[in-house]
């Protein structure tokens, strides 16, 4: 609801085969965006790599120089069609990151949920990772937190922590 006319939203689905649900659309066309979201359904085999590639292509198509250009991947991470190896998917995200489009992963589901892959993809895509398990968490992540994390303020930041051995034991 906070998107404006200068923002762009595109939606790609990748259950079974990948396809565009919504071409890059100005953010102030909320009814169009909401109608496209309402069409989405979970189910079928997951061709994640093809969906990610198509999402990056749409992000480059709607690229805004100097803007925040990001793919949001909402999935359980159980990619079971096409490129399914973790290393191949991470390499895909690394290559696409060079185009100036970040990747944030939003994890959903239980059972086959692949948290490790979701974290790796977000890390290699210069993005954030969040797990959403209910409506309250969705609101927190998508409305309250995500807006504050879309702007990258540091890359490849490292933190070194040294504990006082007299205060901390193994």
Positions of predicted regions on the chain:
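Glycine-rich, Lys/Arg-enriched anion-binding loops that position phosphate/diphosphate groups
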Residues: 167-170
């Amino acid at each position: 609801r906070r998107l404006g006319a200068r923002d762009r939203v595109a939606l790609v689905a990748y259950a079974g085969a990948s396809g565009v649900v919504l071409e890059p659309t100005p953010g102030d066309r909320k009814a169009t965006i909401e109608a496209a979201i309402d069409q989405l359904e979970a189910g079928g085999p997951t061709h994640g790599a093809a969906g990610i590639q198509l999402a990056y292509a749409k992000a480059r198509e709607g690229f805004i120089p100097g803007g925040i250009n990001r793919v949001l991947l909402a999935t359980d991470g159980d990619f079971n069609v096409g490129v399914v190896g973790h290393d191949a998917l991470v390499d895909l995200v690394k290559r696409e990151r060079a185009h100036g489009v970040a990747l944030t992963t939003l994890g959903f589901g239980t059972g086959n949920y692949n948290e490790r892959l979701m974290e790796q993809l977000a890390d290699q895509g210069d993005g954030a990772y969040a797990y959403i398990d209910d409506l309250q968490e969705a609101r927190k992540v998508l409305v309250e937190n995500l807006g504050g994390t879309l702007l990258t303020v540091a890359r490849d930041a490292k933190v070194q922590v040294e504990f006082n051995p007299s205060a901390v034991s193994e």
